[in-house]
Swiss-Prot record:
Gene name of the record: lit-1
Function: Has a role in the Wnt signaling pathway controlling the asymmetry of cell divisions during embryogenesis. Operates in the AB and EMS cell lineages influencing cell specification. Required for body wall muscle development, endoderm development, pop-1 asymmetry and T-cell division asymmetry. Component of the beta-catenin-lit-1 complex which promotes the phosphorylation, down-regulation and subcellular relocation of pop-1. Regulates plp-1 nuclear localization in embryos. Plays a role in male tail tip morphogenesis.
Subcellular locations according to the entry: Cytoplasm, Cell cortex; Nucleus
Source organism: Caenorhabditis elegans
Consequence recorded when altering residue 541 to Y: In or131; loss of pop-1 asymmetry and protruding vulva phenotype and defects in gonadal migration and development
EC number: 2.7.11.24
InterPro entries, sorted: Kinase-like_dom_sf, MAP_kinase, MAP_kinase_CS, Prot_kinase_dom, Protein_kinase_ATP_BS, Ser/Thr_kinase_AS
Record's protein name: Serine/threonine kinase NLK
Enzyme class per UniProt: transferase
The reaction(s) this protein catalyses: L-seryl-[protein] + ATP = O-phospho-L-seryl-[protein] + ADP + H(+); L-threonyl-[protein] + ATP = O-phospho-L-threonyl-[protein] + ADP + H(+)
Self-association state and partner proteins as the record states: Component of the beta-catenin-lit-1 complex (also called the lit-1/wrm-1 complex or the wrm-1/lit-1 kinase complex) at least composed of lit-1 and wrm-1. Interacts with wrm-1 (via N-terminus); the interaction is direct and activates lit-1 kinase activity which leads to the phosphorylation of pop-1. This promotes pop-1 interaction with par-5 and translocation of pop-1 from the nucleus to the cytoplasm. Interacts with pop-1 (when phosphorylated on 'Ser-118' and 'Ser-127'); the interaction is dependent on the beta-catenin-lit-1 complex.
Disruption phenotype: Defects in body wall muscle, endoderm development and pop-1 asymmetry. RNAi-mediated knockdown disrupts tail tip morphogenesis resulting in retention of the pointed larval tail tip in adult males (also known as the Lep phenotype). RNAi-mediated knockdown causes the transcription factor plp-1 to localize at much lower levels in nuclei and instead accumulate in the cytoplasm, during embryonic development.
A family per Pfam: Pkinase
Outcome, altering residue 400 to A: No detectable kinase activity
Amino acid sequence: MVSWGRGKDAYYLYISREQEEDDDDSLSFYSSQKDTEDEFCGCLFPDPEIPGSSSSSGCSSSSTELYDLAAAHAALISRQQQILSQAIPIIPEHQLAAVAAHHQHHQQLHPSVQYQLVAAATHHNHHQPQAAQPHYSAVVPRSDVIQQPPHFALHHHLQNLVQQQQQQQAHHHHQQLVGEMALVSHTHPAAVGSTTCYEKNQQKQQQVQQIPTQPQVAHVSSNAILAAAQPFYPPPVQDSQPDRPIGYGAFGVVWSVTDPRSGKRVALKKMPNVFQNLASCKRVFREIKMLSSFRHDNVLSLLDILQPANPSFFQELYVLTELMQSDLHKIIVSPQALTPDHVKVFVYQILRGLKYLHTANILHRDIKPGNLLVNSNCILKICDFGLARTWDQRDRLNMTHEVVTQYYRAPELLMGARRYTGAVDIWSVGCIFAELLQRKILFQAAGPIEQLQMIIDLLGTPSQEAMKYACEGAKNHVLRAGLRAPDTQRLYKIASPDDKNHEAVDLLQKLLHFDPDKRISVEEALQHRYLEEGRLRFHSCMCSCCYTKPNMPSRLFAQDLDPRHESPFDPKWEKDMSRLSMFELREKMYQFVMDRPALYGVALCINPQSAAYKNFASSSVAQASELPPSPQAW
């Protein structure tokens, strides 16, 4: 059994011989994980599944403890060789022979697995094999690529190969005992006339790859909402934690459930009434297309999409994503102490994820603390792309201004602008920055007009040039109120109470510039001096793009610390989608879902026998009365 623990100096990998089945969840120290109580894990969040603890979208406001960034940074400098940023599934040495035999026929193996094979061969050339209790080979660190393929499927594939060879050997031994002349070939099992164990297992594996049109529940407890659509090997140990709702919004309901294929806790988002109208259909199609393309430390990625059993009943969508332990809103309102180091690391990660989105030609349009998921290691991920849309940076297209939660809405949106850019997301980051510094919402107004007035009270009356995208009614309202000077003293009080941190004041002013054309860009904000320490801490011990190899004197940093999206969305895609009817969009969405390969090669389905199924089926999105107020109709 493999698990991560954290000591005073580094992360450590625990290897137990009690269980040989690898769990990919325990090999990632920055993803959602169920933390056990041991002497190395003293700065973690409470378990998200225990009542009263924080979760990714729950309602609890209990105290949480964050990772000590300063201690981690100092520890990494002193003992960098002990840091393992990621590990691959470990193969017992007594099973490496099966992998080597398979390697003769399939030349393409993971480089780290080949490393183990070479190491094992070298070991056996110098030492005689001993019939002792099997031990595990050394852990090989990951490569320097951010987007790593999941190792879970590879490990289970190797387990299947090992089991196949064991079955062949047992069958061969049985044939010798009964005196039969036929021998089972390890390399050509099909040469045997009768059906061998190898062939039976091959047939079983082929059946697993075939996804039936009518899924049947398999390998699932009666309490689990998710079930595998077909049998698979090996059946994981069922998680005893109950499935439960953890949040809901205008476009979906999120539950914390167990993936029956891995035993890992994941977030299941239910999107009902997808085809209620054309706007809803476009919004859902945008969201799943975006989530499918994300591969970034600071952006929530899609794990799987449940395939509909029948296209005639394709009315709602079920999406699996990572499960995080809390969000930034719960941290801000909790009694947890936030140091300047925490603020710098959080703001840096928000901007880092936002750069990834903007370079993909995506506007999030709802950046707020509740949509910024955080785990106990202070890894932050941007989530909830229900209001996001693609955007042509060279052309200002007419878009709705009914976006962004009011407290974090940019002044151009409050003033009815129909043409806007990624500057609306930058304004939201500025509001969150101030909220982290003073532990309260910066502009907390009862309505949009009061919200605009609070902004003017702080920043002063804008010029005509700064209001060039606003509608005439909003301009007249601002001008009738008279001229107001900016409250510079209050800005300094928010960003620098001790009157020493002038860099924080400078960044806050640039993020909260009234004129969207003069507001700082995400690339410029990432290069601001205030965030230099946050960048250093993040890439010293938290990111997946930089790492430390054994016997290396220093940490290896990625060439691009703030990567761009690899394949930006073509602005024409949004225009082409606007020309389609709802029937055509439904067909495209169905084809997209069906063409996407299932995670681990095994499809999932909803289990109607689950004890929580009735509550899950009846769960609905937020009602109109629960939603924030609409923008002012100027």
